[in-house]
């Protein structure tokens, strides 16, 4: 499908402290037109560097910083590294399932994750309503990849599904688990995309200076959107 977009109406937020690089200021461009809020249009907007939060579609539009680089993986061309292959071998006893709704005990897992990993973030303290407002939307198919150790839920990866691609929206997991569950969630999302014949898995923004956000370049073959051209 074409990834071209023509003129769309956007609004700019005020500058505010960056969530990922605290010493910098960020602002975002928000897509304002209601007809952009469809699965087909969002797929095009993803290819042009946009993301969503709830029903809001946005992209970074900072005055002097270009650290946020949209990144995606070409599913047919995926090349696993040695460490990723070792991780999958260690995870052979785990299972995953893509579901339309989260298991009833999801919030206990989510709470442990937020308290352990993001106590200083905007999602603390963890609240069900806040997460629903953040993750749900009214115009896109969103499913939930569950990872189990036996019968125990150890990770959930919120995944937006479109005709030709999927988007890794948000992942939470057992914070003290010995395996790299965030990486494993992406590997299982890639397995899902292979099964469903998707072309791309979008991973959001790569931020080299932010340790929590610079792991995404470890997945090959990836592309980054630089100067409005996908490279890689």
Swiss-Prot record:
GO cellular component, one term: cytoplasm
Swiss-Prot/TrEMBL catalytic activity: N-terminal L-glutamyl-[protein] + L-leucyl-tRNA(Leu) = N-terminal L-leucyl-L-glutamyl-[protein] + tRNA(Leu) + H(+); N-terminal L-aspartyl-[protein] + L-leucyl-tRNA(Leu) = N-terminal L-leucyl-L-aspartyl-[protein] + tRNA(Leu) + H(+)
UniProt KW Transferase keyword: yes
KW Cytoplasm (keyword) present: yes
SUPFAM superfamilies associated with the record: Acyl-CoA N-acyltransferases (Nat)
GO MF: arginyl-tRNA--protein transferase activity; leucyl-tRNA--protein transferase activity
InterPro entries found in the cross-reference section: Acyl_CoA_acyltransferase (IPR016181), Asp_Glu_LeuTrfase (IPR017138), N-end_Aminoacyl_Trfase (IPR030700), N-end_Aminoacyl_Trfase_C (IPR007472), N-end_Aminoacyl_Trfase_N (IPR007471)
Cell compartment(s), UniProt: Cytoplasm
UniProt superkingdom: Bacteria
Keywords of the record: Acyltransferase, Cytoplasm, Transferase
Main localization of the protein described in the UniProt heading: cytoplasm
GO biological process: ubiquitin-dependent protein catabolic process via the N-end rule pathway
Enzyme Commission number(s) of this protein: 2.3.2.29
Cited function: Functions in the N-end rule pathway of protein degradation where it conjugates Leu from its aminoacyl-tRNA to the N-termini of proteins containing an N-terminal aspartate or glutamate.
Family: Belongs to the R-transferase family. Bpt subfamily.
UniProt xrefs under NCBIfam families: PRK01305.1-3 (NF002342), PRK01305.2-2 (NF002345), PRK01305.2-3 (NF002346)
Full protein name: Aspartate/glutamate leucyltransferase
Organism: Vibrio vulnificus (strain YJ016)
Recorded name of the encoding gene: bpt
């Amino acid at each position: 499908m074409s990834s071209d977009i023509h003129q769309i109406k956007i609004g700019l937020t005020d500058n505010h402290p960056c969530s990922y690089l605290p010493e910098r200021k960020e602002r975002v461009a928000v897509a304002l037109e209601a007809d952009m809020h469809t699965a087909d249009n969002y797929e095009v907007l993803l290819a042009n560097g946009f993301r969503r939060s709830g029903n809001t579609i946005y992209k970074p539009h900072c005055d002097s910083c270009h650290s946020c680089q949209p990144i995606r993986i070409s599913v047919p061309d995926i090349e696993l590294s040695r460490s990723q292959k070792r991780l999958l071998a260690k995870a052979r006893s785990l299972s995953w399932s893509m579901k339309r709704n989260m298991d009833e005990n999801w919030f206990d897992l989510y709470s442990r994750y937020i308290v352990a990993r993001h106590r200083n973030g905007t999602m603390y303290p963890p609240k069900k309503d806040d997460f629903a407002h953040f993750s749900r939307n009214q115009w896109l198919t969103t499913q939930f990849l569950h990872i189990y150790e036996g019968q125990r839920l150890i990770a959930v990866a919120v995944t937006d599904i479109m005709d030709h691609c999927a988007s890794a929206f948000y992942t939470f997991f057992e914070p003290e688990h010995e395996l790299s569950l965030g990486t494993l969630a992406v590997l299982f999302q890639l397995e899902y995309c292979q099964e469903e014949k998707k072309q791309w898995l979008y991973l959001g923004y790569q931020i080299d200076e932010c340790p929590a956000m610079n792991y995404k370049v470890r997945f090959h073959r990836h592309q980054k959107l630089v100067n409005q051209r996908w490279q890689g």
